[in-house]
């Protein structure tokens, strides 16, 4: 939602001030380059508490990079290069640049530095009013399941070894078999931990075997999440077999 703000910030005229005149802000392709420079590759929003990976030099929001720092062998989410979590540092130069540009709030039109835009938008009455008027989610057919805004994401998962994101269940199995077949580390199964019965602290002794035996099918396709794990597994197996 901040992409238009970045372009607006890049194209606004510079106010005169003390010292030598500043060069005109970039426009066109240069503005697009500025937008890319200030956007986190993970959340695609303006950087928030930006941090940089020393090895490859890529920058992310501190919070966005956190899942990668929790795995035994972290990889850069952008280039997949291994990195040392101890060598992730605050991107001070990026924060300084964010503080030098202002853009109008999309709700109240007040000019705010890009560094403070997220916090401003979260408390802006005009923005909240706009959000309140947005259409609300309504299921196409009646369902006993909670609406999506109230349930965890069970469609995509994060690799517990390297932090690769947005993997569906089959992609997670394929990714782990191709990239982590010989990794001896005990890790938490992201599929199981997303389930109501899952234990987010339990680490599988042999995660790859667990994946192959437990997660050949998608729980989302077959499972009623209101029943316990064993009943859900049996129901899913029965329905899966009936489709084959």
UniProtKB/Swiss-Prot annotation:
<feature type="binding site">
    <location>
        <position position="120"/>
    </location>
    <ligand>
        <name>Zn(2+)</name>
    </ligand>
</feature>
<dbReference type="Pfam" id="PF05605">
    <property type="entry name" value="zf-Di19"/>
</dbReference>
<protein>
    <recommendedName>
        <fullName>E3 ubiquitin-protein ligase RNF166</fullName>
        <ecNumber>2.3.2.27</ecNumber>
    </recommendedName>
</protein>
<comment type="pathway">
    <text>Protein modification; protein ubiquitination.</text>
</comment>
<feature type="binding site">
    <location>
        <position position="124"/>
    </location>
    <ligand>
        <name>Zn(2+)</name>
    </ligand>
</feature>
<dbReference type="InterPro" id="IPR017907">
    <property type="entry name" value="Znf_RING_CS"/>
</dbReference>
<dbReference type="GO" id="GO:0005737">
    <property type="term" value="C:cytoplasm"/>
</dbReference>
<dbReference type="GO" id="GO:0061630">
    <property type="term" value="F:ubiquitin protein ligase activity"/>
</dbReference>
<dbReference type="InterPro" id="IPR034734">
    <property type="entry name" value="ZF_C2HC_RNF"/>
</dbReference>
<keyword id="KW-0479">Metal-binding</keyword>
<keyword id="KW-0808">Transferase</keyword>
<dbReference type="Pfam" id="PF18574">
    <property type="entry name" value="zf_C2HC_14"/>
</dbReference>
<feature type="binding site">
    <location>
        <position position="108"/>
    </location>
    <ligand>
        <name>Zn(2+)</name>
    </ligand>
</feature>
<dbReference type="InterPro" id="IPR051438">
    <property type="entry name" value="RNF_E3_ubiq-protein_ligase"/>
</dbReference>
<keyword id="KW-0963">Cytoplasm</keyword>
<feature type="zinc finger region" description="RING-type">
    <location>
        <begin position="40"/>
        <end position="80"/>
    </location>
</feature>
<comment type="function">
    <text>E3 ubiquitin-protein ligase that promotes the ubiquitination of different substrates.</text>
</comment>
<feature type="compositionally biased region" description="Pro residues">
    <location>
        <begin position="15"/>
        <end position="28"/>
    </location>
</feature>
<feature type="domain" description="UIM">
    <location>
        <begin position="228"/>
        <end position="244"/>
    </location>
</feature>
<keyword id="KW-0863">Zinc-finger</keyword>
<dbReference type="GO" id="GO:0008270">
    <property type="term" value="F:zinc ion binding"/>
</dbReference>
<dbReference type="GO" id="GO:0006511">
    <property type="term" value="P:ubiquitin-dependent protein catabolic process"/>
</dbReference>
<dbReference type="InterPro" id="IPR013083">
    <property type="entry name" value="Znf_RING/FYVE/PHD"/>
</dbReference>
<dbReference type="InterPro" id="IPR008598">
    <property type="entry name" value="Di19_Zn-bd"/>
</dbReference>
<dbReference type="InterPro" id="IPR001841">
    <property type="entry name" value="Znf_RING"/>
</dbReference>
<dbReference type="GO" id="GO:0000209">
    <property type="term" value="P:protein polyubiquitination"/>
</dbReference>
<keyword id="KW-0833">Ubl conjugation pathway</keyword>
<feature type="binding site">
    <location>
        <position position="105"/>
    </location>
    <ligand>
        <name>Zn(2+)</name>
    </ligand>
</feature>
<feature type="zinc finger region" description="C2HC RNF-type">
    <location>
        <begin position="105"/>
        <end position="124"/>
    </location>
</feature>
<dbReference type="InterPro" id="IPR003903">
    <property type="entry name" value="UIM_dom"/>
</dbReference>
<feature type="region of interest" description="Disordered">
    <location>
        <begin position="10"/>
        <end position="30"/>
    </location>
</feature>
<dbReference type="Pfam" id="PF13923">
    <property type="entry name" value="zf-C3HC4_2"/>
</dbReference>
<keyword id="KW-0862">Zinc</keyword>
């Amino acid at each position: 939602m901040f992409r238009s703000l970045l372009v607006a910030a890049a194209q606004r005229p510079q106010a005169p001030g003390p010292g030598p005149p500043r060069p005109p802000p970039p426009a066109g392709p240069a503005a697009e380059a500025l937008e890319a420079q200030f956007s986190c590759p993970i959340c695609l929003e303006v950087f928030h508490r930006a941090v940089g990976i020393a090895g490859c030099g890529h920058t992310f929001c501190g919070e966005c990079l956190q899942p990668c720092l929790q795995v035994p062998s972290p990889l850069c989410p952008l280039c997949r290069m291994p990195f040392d979590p101890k060598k992730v540092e605050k991107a001070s130069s990026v924060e300084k640049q964010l503080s030098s540009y202002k853009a109008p709030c999309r709700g109240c039109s007040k000019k705010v530095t890009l560094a403070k835009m997220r916090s401003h938008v979260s408390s802006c009455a005009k923005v909240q009013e706009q959000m309140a008027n947005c259409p609300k989610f309504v299921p196409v057919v009646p369902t006993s399941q909670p609406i999506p805004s109230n349930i965890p994401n069970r469609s995509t998962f994060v690799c517990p070894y390297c932090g690769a994101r947005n993997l569906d269940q089959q992609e997670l199995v394929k990714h782990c078999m191709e990239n982590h077949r010989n990794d001896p580390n005990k890790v938490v199964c992201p599929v199981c931990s997303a389930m109501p019965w899952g234990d987010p602290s339990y680490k599988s002794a042999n995660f790859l075997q667990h994946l192959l035996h437990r997660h050949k099918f998608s729980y989302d396709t077959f499972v009623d999440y209101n029943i316990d794990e064993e009943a859900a597994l049996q129901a899913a197996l029965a329905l899966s077999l009936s489709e084959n």
